[in-house]
């Protein structure tokens, strides 16, 4: 997958996931994260806005969970596509269905609202029709949130 486009922007128009609050390219009111593959890891940077806060100056935990959910799922699906040789950036590209089954989150420290966040996700286990992803959110080089996410990919089996 050599495209410089964000993974979310490779999802064909008309797919329902494009309206997702967290990662939907067509949701003007959503978080609109942009994930990219760097070797075997999904990486995104994202900047919160004032309305994403919990306590003054800190990111809301639900927003952090949404960032992890969406980034982990799109990373798992894109890496699956890479494994099977499916081109996501071609004229007739298709994006396999997938969804988050479970998320286990550890909030390690408050996530500062003003920092540019880096989100990193890596597949750590392959099941027959699922991928387990380790995902973390970093602010100023410090890990703030760590999660394990199980993503179901029906076409993987």
What kind of region is each of these model predictions?
Residues 1-12, 102, 109-157:
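HotDog/MaoC-like acyl-thioester-processing domains
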């Amino acid at each position: 997958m050599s495209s410089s486009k964000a993974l979310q922007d490779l999802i064909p128009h008309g797919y329902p996931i494009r309206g997702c609050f967290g990662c939907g390219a067509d949701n003007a009111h959503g978080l609109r994260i942009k994930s990219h593959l760097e070797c075997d890891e999904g990486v995104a940077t994202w900047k919160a806005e004032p309305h994403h806060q919990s306590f003054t100056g800190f990111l809301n935990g639900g927003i952090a969970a949404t960032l992890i959910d969406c980034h982990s799922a799109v990373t798992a699906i894109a890496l699956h596509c890479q494994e099977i040789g499916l081109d996501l950036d071609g004229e007739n590209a298709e994006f396999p269905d997938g969804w988050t089954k479970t998320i286990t989150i550890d909030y390690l420290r408050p996530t500062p609202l003003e920092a540019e966040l880096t989100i990193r996700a890596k597949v750590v286990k392959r099941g027959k029709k699922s991928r387990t992803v380790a995902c973390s959110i970093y602010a100023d080089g410090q890990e703030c949130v760590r999660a394990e996410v199980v993503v179901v990919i029906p076409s993987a089996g």
